[in-house]
Amino acid sequence: MAVQQKIRIKLKSYDHSLVDKWASRIIDVVKETDAIIFGPIPLPTKSHVYTVNRSPHVDKKSREQFSFSSHKRLIEIMNPTSRTIDLLMKLELPSGVDVEIKS
């Protein structure tokens, strides 16, 4: 049995529309090369809440909360060709999207 090569691409952003847009763009590029693709698989959204004092000296009970969510998508590419990797390297992702690639 032959060992299949696999590439995992994880996209992270604070804006869910950016993640979905670029996940679909990556899928379109990979489909041109006849590689098998799974995804985008939505991973759990993490919410971060930060609490700060409104006043620097008094009124300890007066606080303000800031929250933001980080959205993640996972794309798996099975049996990528050299053309697949070249096309993925040529993609210019926006600064609001963080990309992790594991093979």
UniProtKB/Swiss-Prot annotation:
Gene3D superfamilies associated with the record: Ribosomal protein S10 domain (3.30.70.600)
Record has Membrane as a keyword: no
Keyword Ribosomal protein: yes
GO biological process: translation
Keywords, in A-Z order: Ribonucleoprotein, Ribosomal protein
Family matches, as SUPFAM superfamilies: Ribosomal protein S10 (SSF54999)
One of the record's GO molecular function terms: structural constituent of ribosome
GO cellular component: ribonucleoprotein complex; ribosome
InterPro entries for this protein: Ribosomal_uS10, Ribosomal_uS10_CS, Ribosomal_uS10_dom, Ribosomal_uS10_dom_sf
Entry's family note: Belongs to the universal ribosomal protein uS10 family.
HAMAP family: Ribosomal_uS10
Its biological purpose: Involved in the binding of tRNA to the ribosomes.
Description of how the protein assembles with itself and partners: Part of the 30S ribosomal subunit.
Protein name: Small ribosomal subunit protein uS10
Source organism (scientific name): Chlorobium phaeovibrioides (strain DSM 265 / 1930)
Gene for this chain: rpsJ
